[in-house]
Curated annotation (Swiss-Prot):
Its EC number is 5.3.1.24. One of its GO terms (biological process) is L-tryptophan biosynthetic process. The gene is trpF. It comes from Neisseria gonorrhoeae (strain ATCC 700825 / FA 1090). It catalyses: N-(5-phospho-beta-D-ribosyl)anthranilate = 1-(2-carboxyphenylamino)-1-deoxy-D-ribulose 5-phosphate. Gene3D superfamilies: Aldolase class I (3.20.20.70). The keyword Amino-acid biosynthesis applies. It comes from the Bacteria. This is N-(5'-phosphoribosyl)anthranilate isomerase. The keyword Isomerase applies. Pathway: Amino-acid biosynthesis; L-tryptophan biosynthesis; L-tryptophan from chorismate: step 3/5. One of its GO terms (molecular function) is phosphoribosylanthranilate isomerase activity. Keywords: Amino-acid biosynthesis, Aromatic amino acid biosynthesis, Isomerase, Tryptophan biosynthesis. Belongs to the TrpF family.
């Protein structure tokens, strides 16, 4: 049986975290990128992590952050997986004693084709829409057909996903994991419980 894994990213409150977890999210993303409207600090992250039930993965998202600051956060917040969204290379990403996911901003098929070679130690790749100045969370999607024949390293689909289009996205790409942030929000940084539930329910229906 295939299960479509879901990650709800940009969680900013324990309430949003608990709702997503109870709705069936497999992972929750905490953004440690000060320029993001969904950024949180260590104190907030600790409160969110403490509220979660077992077996929900906590993912820390960084963008071109210093190794020193990443280690400080990892020492104070129970993080299971690191997700890198900046210009980090494999040597940088693999040094933190946590599995890591590397976001790839997709413009062409070669971005997808070359990603596994560039990040051989990644647990998974996350394919997101390219933007010249923003590192994810844009609400934009890329050409999903570029992934239709991809069979490399495990990967996650992101970029412009919503409860309305996640079914189509999975059917086109064959994704086994999906990541959403803005597509389930009431406003930036505040999740809409109904949208979160609908997104996860749709992903679950596609599991087989």
């Amino acid at each position: 049986m295939r299960k479509i894994r879901t990650k709800i990213c940009g969680i900013t409150t324990p309430e949003d975290a608990l709702y997503a977890a109870h709705a069936g999210a497999d992972a929750l993303g905490l953004v440690f990128y000060p320029q993001s409207p969904r950024a949180i600090d260590i104190i907030k992250a600790q409160k969110i992590a403490a509220a979660l039930p077992p077996f929900v993965s906590v993912v820390a998202l960084f963008v071109n952050e210093s190794a020193q600051n990443i280690r400080r956060i990892l020492a104070e917040v129970p993080i299971h997986i690191i997700q890198f969204h900046g210009d980090e290379d494999d040597a940088f990403c693999r040094q933190f004693d946590r599995p890591y996911i590397k976001a790839i901003r997709v413009q062409t098929a070669s971005d997808i084709r070359n990603a596994a070679t560039r990040f051989p130690n990644a647990q998974a790749l996350l394919f997101d829409a390219y933007h010249p100045s923003e590192y994810g969370g844009t609400g934009h999607r890329f050409d999903w057909t570029l992934l239709a024949e991809y069979s490399g390293k495990p990967w996650v689909l992101a970029g412009g996903l919503t409860p309305e289009n996640v079914g189509e996205a999975v059917r086109i790409t064959g994704a086994e994991a999906v990541d959403v942030s803005g597509g389930v929000e009431a406003s930036k940084g505040k999740k809409d419980p109904a949208k979160v539930a609908a997104f996860i329910a749709t992903a679950n229906r596609l599991s087989r």
